[in-house]
Amino acid sequence: MKKLTIVDIAKMAGVGTTTVSRYFNGGNLKKETRERIKEIVDKYNYTPNTFAKALKSTDSKIIGVIVPCLHSYISGNTLKYLDKELKENNYETLIMNANFDENKQLEYIKKLARMNVDGIILLPTTMSKAYESTIKSIDVPVVMLGQEGEYTYSVEYNDFNAARDLTNYVLASGHKKVAYLGVSEDDVAVGYYRKLGVIRALEKYNLESKNILITNFGMEEGYEIVRENI
């Protein structure tokens, strides 16, 4: 038997395809109509194509999430709790891994918009002007995590305070030879504000900020820099 379609279900139930679409999208239907469609769906074990449905409906119930990588602790935990929260609100998560490539992140923003997702959650590691122009060019709400975006919604961490307080704690414990290992200022939150928090704490103790070490997000390079400077 060929794969069942919405058209087939509509014919069997004696309703229009719009009514069947409304059933799958959780729209209002008469009780008997809903039960009739459900009986057919259950009988043939029919599962709607979420992405095909998304392209045809106003409400896709899909949220695209663009992460810089899949192997980091932060990305993994962020995805875990985002997916949990979204599923509790009847949304599906579509994950795109940019592998620390800004061009890929920008490409995925446009790709997800073409797929008619209801929203995009973005974890950027750089903040170039290209993000602003790309986000403004699409008609999909975008939320940035971890970076400030004046032109869109953003959820930020206070990297400056976190780094300053941590450094203050280390210095107050009697340690004076402090090194900072961070990324470049292309990542404004982590590369600039976090480093600035460390420097301000060192200044409070009249210490020079000479051990400022810059790396990328890769574990191997970070390991080598630490090994060379111990």
Each language-model region and where it sits:
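N-terminal helix-turn-helix DNA-binding module of bacterial transcription factors
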Residues: 1-60
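N-terminal helix-turn-helix/winged-helix DNA-binding helices
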Residues: 2-4, 42-80, 89, 99, ...
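Short beta-strand segments enriched in small/hydrophobic residues
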Residues: 17-19, 55-71, 169, 177-184
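Bacterial carbohydrate/catabolite-sensing allosteric modules
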Residues: 43, 84-89, 137-144, 148-230
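Structural motif
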Residues: 93-114, 214-230
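Short beta->alpha connector loops
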Residues: 99-102, 123-128, 148-149
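Active-site-adjacent beta->alpha loops and helix N-cap segments on the catalytic face
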Residues: 127-138
